[in-house]
Amino acid sequence: MLSIDVSHAVSFLSLPYEAALRPRLERAAGWLQNGGGKGSDFIGWVTLPRDYDRGEYARILAAAKKIQGDSKALVVIGIGGSYLGARGVIECLCSPNYNLKKKSTPNIYFIGNGLSSDALREVTELIGDDDFSVNVISKSGTTTEPAVAFRFFREKLEKKYGKEEAAKRIYATTDAHKGALKSLADQEGYEEFVVPDNIGGRYSVLTAVGLLPIAVAGVDLDELMGGAQEMMSLCSKNDYSNPAWQYAAMRHELYRQGKKAELLACFEPAFRFMAEWWKQLYGESEGKEEKGLFPASVDFTADLHSMGQYIQQGERMLMETVVRFAPAEQQMVVPFDEANGDGLNFLAGKTMDFINRQAMDGTLLAHVEGGVPNIILNLDENNARTMGQLIYFFEYACGLSGYLLGVNPFDQPGVEAYKKNMFALLGKPGYEEMGEELRKRLR
């Protein structure tokens, strides 16, 4: 079970905080569990691990099995919360090199998360003539990046299989009742899965948004959802035995005492895209009204050779949260080298996991001594159950954190600014006057 250790952060606080924060945490927890807080129309994720739609869940498993049987590749089209969680889980549990490994499941390509011509062309070339399917994920169907990518891959499918057969290879995860993608899916007969109205994109990993690609990769969804339900039960406790309470409280107090950025660190490279998901989760949920810790991530030990200098001796505005996994089942042992030219024979016979753990502990002590508070998240294993626990833990703590800040943890009004400018510069109907003004400013 996930556990939290705040002992390397509490010494940075000038006053005890638990008793003072308790009433505010109780209120925040009440808003998450019962509604009444800002954005309460979007708290469906809170009970999702218990109350998910069993019928749709069965259809997800059936669709995943079909894709595994008729496709060598699945193209997942989505941006932000529509793909980061799924990619994070797949890479963490199945490997960042998933597509290069020998396996019985299809390759999975994530696209529609940017506007790069090179990225789009590369995925098209990698698929080549292989049989493939598409999972397009968009609540509205009009978000620029995924909508443009879907045009390309829908055309490729229809040219390869014909319109009728192509429709059997397109899976639309979208709004249950409205929107451009919903209308197209109804018209063309695509199999449809639902983006729930009461769950925002960054909180949607455990809905069809994340579950279909994750299932195609061969991850055990029962274990994933089981882990999330275990953490849901633990997070329902309104006291400091709840790890989400501890995490939200410590982050909030460190923020109040001047910390401005939080680094999420892990000593396993496979965790990279889980950290990308975490960055969106906390960045969009807290970063408003000129408030919030800036979420960043580092891959250790690699980034100790790039960002390590700043973390150790740069401006003292950082805090760190470190995710630690239990030792790997398959151990790599350092061989003995008779020449010992590198002077590393003192490591011979030791496992890489042992060496990595000494690096973790050494880094922890150095950073804390250097003025960087550390929160440790310990996971028993790197498997589907613990991943479900971690996802729910981060989501619940994020909701608490947003309410402690006094912001709405479930909206993201700031992301519209760039979109309006982009539409104006692209000549979208209705934006002509704005486009002229922006072009003048760019001269």
Language-model segments: which ranges?
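Short, solvent-exposed amphipathic alpha-helical segments in soluble enzyme
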Residues: 91-94, 125-127, 151-153, 186-188, ...
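Glycine-rich phosphate/diphosphate-binding loops that line cofactor/substrate pockets in enzymes
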Residues: 59-72, 123-131, 250-260, 311-316
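Extended, charge-enriched "interface" segments that sit outside catalytic cores
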Residues: 1-68, 336-342, 346, 434-443
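Active-site phosphate/pyrophosphate-binding segments
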Residues: 161-321, 326-329, 412-443
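C-terminal helical cap and adjacent loop that interface with cofactors, partners, or active-site loops
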Residues: 363-426
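Glycine-rich phosphate-binding loops that contact phosphosugars or nucleotide phosphates
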Residues: 65-238, 424
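Helicase-primase coupling helices
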Residues: 296-383
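Short, charged beta->alpha transition segments
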Residues: 62, 117-125, 248-251, 324, ...
